[in-house]
A protein has these predicted regions:
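Small-residue-biased structural context
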Residues: 1-143
Length: 143
């Protein structure tokens, strides 16, 4: 079975790859491809946040009693990223290459820092504290 750190880190890499593909399409002004890649990225990101916020974070908080700790910080960062995603949506809709590329750089840095915190600290803590973690991941893989 796949562990929480393994599965969620792989999802980070998959999101990063799609994000980079969208950015490359915008840089070439291939707006049709950019929209397709961006929509795919946004869907993956939304699903990833949902898996964390609706399932993993509550399970971790219940297991540890920590509700004002790392999961609260991650939720706040998710909100910041959601706001940037909305700004990127607007830049893409306007076919504003410079605005999109500037915002995408900001989002990429934010995602890298965020992912590092999850991968180095939170996911290993989840693996230690969520008793049915592998079963939860198996459910994610099916859906």
């Amino acid at each position: 079975m796949t562990s929480i750190p393994e599965f969620m880190t792989t999802k980070h890499r998959e999101c990063d790859e799609i994000f980079t593909d969208a950015e490359a399409a915008v840089a070439k002004a291939d707006w049709s491809l950019a929209i397709t890649k961006w929509q795919s990225f946004a869907l993956e990101l939304t699903q990833h946040f949902s898996q964390e916020e609706d399932v993993l974070f509550p399970k971790f908080e219940q297991a540890t009693g920590m509700t004002a700790g790392p999961t609260q910080v991650m939720r706040m960062e998710h909100q910041q990223m959601r706001a940037l995603v909305q700004d990127l949506d607007n830049a893409l809709a306007a076919q504003d290459k410079d605005e999109y590329l500037g915002l995408s750089e900001t989002l990429m840095v934010m995602m890298q820092q965020h992912n590092m915190k999850e991968e180095m600290m939170l996911y290993p803590m989840m693996a230690q504290n969520i008793a049915d973690g592998e079963q939860v991941i198996a459910q994610f893989q099916v859906s």
